[in-house]
């Protein structure tokens, strides 16, 4: 399956980045003809169709049958879960990850809760500061950050990432929310540049190392996600904490890694950022923007794969939009997986049942289309067929 239309990419290079007309976006049938012929699972209930759009975080280093997360996976046919090592409630205790044997047991329990054994079990494992499998838990934990990776030989980079993929696979993690393909174009950027999460300012260099990363993950049966569309490298603020406007900082070149990777790779998923860019959408940040997700990523770029939001509990979203409105906008924007990490604060934690019931109410009120949810289900099923 071809996940990006190359012709649309070449057209994009010569096009302005003016916002896509709302009416055109609403009237188009987004990528339906391109969705792989994978039907929605038979007998999937409304609750399960909704649940198949959700990836959630949870408290616990185990998932026995009576646990809430296991019940939620089984009842709602969740798309997946996201695992963390740090516990936001008690920093002295692990949230989900405390050791190799423990994590292997946890992922097996989680898959046993699922109906198809293909639950997406995800972590952020980039290297450097962003790696959940740390040495203090018995893992390697010393994978270099992206800005250090580019100083190594290609053979060494391949070795590092193959070892990373093998380690993830060995403990049952099948989805790595990486690589980061943001460009290092703002030296004052704390969340990307100063943490060394970017492979550089040159798109071709970023693509080179992101390709090695993706190939290594795929060789070990681990799915990947390009992030953070349409580009977080130029930003000054941190979307974890609050609203971030990149209107006067963002550059079109930040789209280039996505275009180039589309020519050589079958891209699994794309993660959308919470950055606000008035030139692309004068009203909403990227994650909640129909003009950016359905308009630019799907319509202009021709991407028909799975689109996942960044954590919708981050300050950029959580502080500005209520839960119901966030769900409505995120679904209508064209996202397939809505990520709720339940990680950033105790107050922001939300029950899966609350998410499902809110979306169900949105469907019943006509504010969200069931057809859009079923289209997302098909894209998710197609993605899971890779596992």
Set out the residue ranges of the language-model regions.
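Short, well-ordered coil/turn segments that N-cap beta-strands
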Residues: 52, 79, 115-119, 173-174, ...
């Amino acid at each position: 399956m071809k996940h990006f239309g190359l012709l649309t990419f070449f057209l994009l290079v010569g096009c302005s980045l003016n916002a896509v007309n709302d009416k055109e976006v609403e009237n188009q049938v987004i990528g339906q003809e391109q969705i792989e012929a994978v039907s929605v699972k038979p007998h999937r209930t409304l609750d399960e169709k909704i649940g198949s759009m959700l990836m959630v975080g949870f408290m616990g280093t185990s998932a026995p049958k009576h646990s809430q997360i296991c019940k939620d996976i089984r009842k709602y046919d969740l798309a997946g879960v996201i695992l963390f090592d740090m516990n936001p409630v008690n920093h002295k205790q692990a949230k989900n990850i405390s050791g190799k044997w423990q994590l292997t047991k946890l992922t097996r329990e989680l898959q046993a809760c699922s109906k198809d054994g293909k639950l997406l079990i995800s972590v952020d494992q980039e290297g450097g500061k962003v790696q959940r499998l740390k040495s203090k838990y018995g893992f390697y934990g010393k994978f270099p950050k992206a800005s250090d990776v580019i100083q190594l030989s290609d053979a060494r980079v391949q070795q590092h990432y193959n070892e990373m993929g093998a380690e993830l696979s060995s403990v049952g993690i099948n989805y790595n929310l990486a690589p980061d393909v943001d460009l290092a174009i703002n030296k004052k950027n704390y969340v990307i540049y100063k943490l060394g999460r970017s492979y550089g300012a040159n798109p071709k260099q970023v693509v080179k190392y992101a390709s090695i990363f993706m190939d290594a993950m795929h060789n070990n049966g681990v799915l990947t996600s390009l992030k953070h569309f349409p580009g977080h490298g130029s930003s000054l603020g941190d979307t974890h904490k609050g609203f971030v406007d990149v209107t006067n900082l963002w550059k079109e070149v930040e789209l280039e890694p996505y275009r180039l990777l589309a020519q050589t790779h079958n891209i699994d998923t794309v993660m959308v950022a919470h950055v606000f860019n008035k030139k692309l959408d004068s009203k909403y940040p990227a994650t909640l923007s129909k003009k950016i997700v359905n308009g630019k990523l799907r319509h202009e770029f021709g991407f028909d794969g799975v689109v996942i939001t960044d954590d919708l509990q981050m300050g950029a979203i959580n502080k500005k939009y209520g839960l119901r409105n966030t769900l409505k906008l995120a679904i209508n924007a064209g996202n397939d997986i809505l990520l709720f990490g339940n990680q950033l604060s105790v107050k922001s934690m939300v029950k899966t049942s609350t998410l499902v019931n809110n979306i169900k109410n949105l469907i019943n009120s006509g504010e969200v289309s069931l057809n859009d949810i079923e289209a997302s289900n098909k894209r998710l099923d197609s993605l899971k067929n890779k596992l």
